[in-house]
Amino acid sequence: MNRLKKSHRQKSLFWRPIAPNPRWQKENPTAHGSTDTGGFGYNGGNEEVKTSSTMMNGIHALVNERQNEWLRGYEVDIKSRFDNIESVLKDILAQQSQLNFVSWANQQLFAKLGVSLTEQDWQSGVQLQSQKGFQFLYGKTLFAQFMRMSEDFFVNDPLSGQRKQEAERMFKEAGFHAVGIAPCADGRLAHILSYVLRLPYALARRKAHAGVMFDVSESVRNWVFIEHTRFRDGQPNLADEPTRYLKIAVYHFSKADPTHQGCAAHGSDDHKAAQAALQKLKDFKQAIENRFGCGSTVQTLLLGLNTDDDSMKVHIPNASGEVCLDRYVETEQLYQATMNLPDSEAKQALENAIVTCNQALGSTAPQPELVKLLSWLIGNNFSQIAYVNQYENGCYSDIGHAERFIGIGNGFEEVQLRNLSYYSFLDTVEEGVNDVDVGIKIFKGLNVKKGLPIPIIIRCDYDGRVPGSKDRAEAKALRIEKALHNRYQELSAPGLLQTLPTLRDFTSCKPAERLPGLADLSAKQRTA
């Protein structure tokens, strides 16, 4: 159990590169390629029908092994880029006697990490006191890796997250024209879409808050925008079609260490975390009905993620769409119960389990369309359960926090990996101060104790169609950066707070744009 309680970035014994598979390489040569994967992408991951011989080998009929292999390759590749920064930089800085050090250092950095820094960055880092210079260069290198990841993500679409047609069809058949998901800001939930639920990132609007304490008013404004787009443009469907908006909240818990590795925002109290998320869903639904009438009702869904193994509690709504904490199914139990069933029987068993869950507690069953959708999502989660079983021996070695950086602002679609980033949606530091404080507290344990800086990436999205939108987003990003350094001066002064302001046009698939920030201004002054 001591191994499970570790919260630093420790690689599992099963953390290894994927052995080349000729068949897989032919269809998807790299984790970042733009090769067409056909039915291999995010269509629920269950298109290939398993034979009886496959089931005899212990493979669940609803698990997509090829997709798991592909996702693992991406995860290992991206995380290694961030995890090796410290050791590579220390090796380089230990050899400052090299002739033409800056040029040599950049060559070494690119050869080992695939990124390079500007000559000004290297000169500034070398001029600073040893530890502060290392912290400066660490931040610059990590930010360069993020920009590289962002470009790869939006240009090459390595997770096929822009291919959302099949998933959209599933939700529309269930009566939903749009999906919003509100997970906790905890980095152990950052992969909720692409991995846990196996959904394309472009399908759902994701905005994370510590403890799932999302802003109800902001969520209502987004709902109004979606409904207006339906009315004016007929997108994603016509306003007179009988479909609704689906709002999903995701809290989290840990069965291995419930009193320490649960939700920090709720004191690792699982019931409080679930109750708070449910109350936010109720408030959101009530706000829309109060403002726009009962005919404008939305559907809500509550999920609980076990961050030890990525299995879930799926809280089953009744016939009226009401959610209750006591009505839920556990995907790990359903995974085991359906292990030896063929594809069609396993799917039917899931639908039966959803219906009987409510009946056992004297409640009504969900609408048939919702039963089918929930069954599909649970089946998707089976692939993630198998993923953790295969590559993490059934339980993550880093069951606690092990994030590499903090992301604040909006967007961050390119962050789709578990424990890569602590991400919190905010408009201003003042409004999101509680979320940011939680992130800073986490990184004091992860980084500061080891002499590493806390890297914070700021993202402000803009609408490229709107005149002045980019300028306003830039001013906002720089304002947030300044507010961070003012609030956390005890970290900023010794170089333990490194920040990168970025922008992105959310109307396109273009990557993040780097802005010159406070660190760049200071570096320019030092080298002038």
Curated annotation (Swiss-Prot):
Keywords carried by this UniProt record: Bacterial microcompartment, Carbon dioxide fixation, Carboxysome, Lyase, Metal-binding, Zinc
Reactions the enzyme catalyzes: hydrogencarbonate + H(+) = CO2 + H2O
Superkingdom of origin organism: Bacteria
Residues the record marks as active site: D186
EC number: 4.2.1.1
Principal EC category: lyase
CC per GO annotation: carboxysome
Localization (cell): Carboxysome
Binding residue positions for Zn(2+): C184, H252, C263
Induction info: Induced by growth in low levels of dissolved inorganic carbon (DIC) (at protein level).
Cofactor, free-text remark: Binds 1 Zn(2+) per monomer.
Quaternary assembly: Homodimer.
Protein name: Carboxysome shell carbonic anhydrase
Native species: Hydrogenovibrio crunogenus (strain DSM 25203 / XCL-2)
Taxonomy of the source species: Bacteria, Pseudomonadati, Pseudomonadota, Gammaproteobacteria, Thiotrichales
Originating gene: csoS3
